[in-house]
Curated annotation (Swiss-Prot):
Keywords for the protein's UniProt record, in alphabetical order: Cell cycle, Cell division, Cytoplasm, GTP-binding, Nucleotide-binding, Septation
Binding-site residues, GTP: 40-44, 127-129, 158, 161, 204
Gene Ontology MF term list: GTP binding; GTPase activity
Gene3D superfamilies: Tubulin/FtsZ, C-terminal domain (3.30.1330.20), Tubulin/FtsZ, GTPase domain (3.40.50.1440)
A GO CC annotation given for this chain: cytoplasm
GO-annotated biological processes: cell division; FtsZ-dependent cytokinesis; protein polymerization
Organism of provenance: Halobacterium salinarum (strain ATCC 700922 / JCM 11081 / NRC-1)
Gene: ftsZ2
Protein name: Cell division protein FtsZ 2
Family of the protein in this entry: Belongs to the FtsZ family.
Gly residues bias locations: 367-376
The protein's assembly and partners: Homodimer. Polymerizes to form a dynamic ring structure in a strictly GTP-dependent manner. Interacts directly with several other division proteins. FtsZ1 and FtsZ2 could also form copolymers whose stoichiometry is balanced by CdrS regulation.
Amino acid sequence: MQDIVQDALDNAEAEQREMDGDGDGDEFGDPRIVIVGCGGAGNNTVNRLYNIGVEGADTVAINTDKQHLKMIKADTKILVGKSLTNGLGAGGDPSMGERATEMAQGTIKEVLGDADLVFVTAGMGGGTGTGAAPVVSKIAKEQGAIVVGMVSTPFNVERARTVKAEEGLEKLREKADSIIVLDNNRLLDYVPNLPIGKAFSVMDQIIAETVKGISETITQPSLINLDYADMTAIMNQGGVAVMLVGETQDKNKTNEVVKDAMNHPLLDVDYRGASGGLVHITGGPDLTLKEAEGIADNITERLDASANVIWGARIQESYKGKVRVMAIMTGVQSAQVLGPSTQKQADKSRRELQDVDSKQRAADDAGAGGFGGAHSDGGQDEVEQENGLDVIR
């Protein structure tokens, strides 16, 4: 038996060297992953991702603010709603951001045409990000992609932005397969004494690392592989998702890395009873099968008994003596994302807006002699022509 084990070890080393040498082979093709940043916060995340580099993913920045877009680095940049905003932004009005993005849907369809997995990142509560994210998600879904929303919510003191964020989250949840929400209020607990610019950069970095981790889990070869089909099986279950990331160099890897992952600083969720879980473990050549299985087991033990759990593992020389775990749990419960109080507020806000719209329509009908006040932008072709898009690739 010892001879068999030794032969297996020798063969495994030879196979690993061959796989490492063949890592760039592309004859079978890879899923196309696109990361779309909407509005100021989304653009900042895309800019950070572009700078740190994401293997196998394209970055797209969409904004109504021309000056901010100029400062962003991305594979593709799209200025939307130029005829509406003159490139000066949406003024904190989500309906303006929504309309501007709808005007550019022909261009966005072209950019996302062959995408398999699309991340849509934005800050909820502003104008462009809140309005654009659901539109981009809808377009990506219609093109056949799996869509994951990755958004942050405003501080509690920003009351008007909070109401807008709730309504935006409701729309995004309807259009995306899953949404991962990070709470800006947690920055007050996590990095209370950092200068405000650096504190927000922490949020950008966490979102960027999350997207990078998911993307490279799919595109990079692993010992126990996770592929696009696995991601689809988990993300298709929809709802709110949570991303857990942990890393340790402790000798007790199995417990410590899970403990580190559980202490996620920026999302208040209870993932007991989650409907799905995808776990990816990265370790050095010293990572044992028992340790890897133990980590996957510990991090998923609170999930529902019928939860669909898929796990994989990758060995990297640079991780010798340490281990990293990345987990996505879908179908979790979060008071931040349309919990009872949030849903009630969103319903109330929507009713108030509908009442205002109804009164306005009645007034328009009366002024038009009863022929109705309906009007359009002249159809998609005309709107596209008037939009004055700036697309930089």
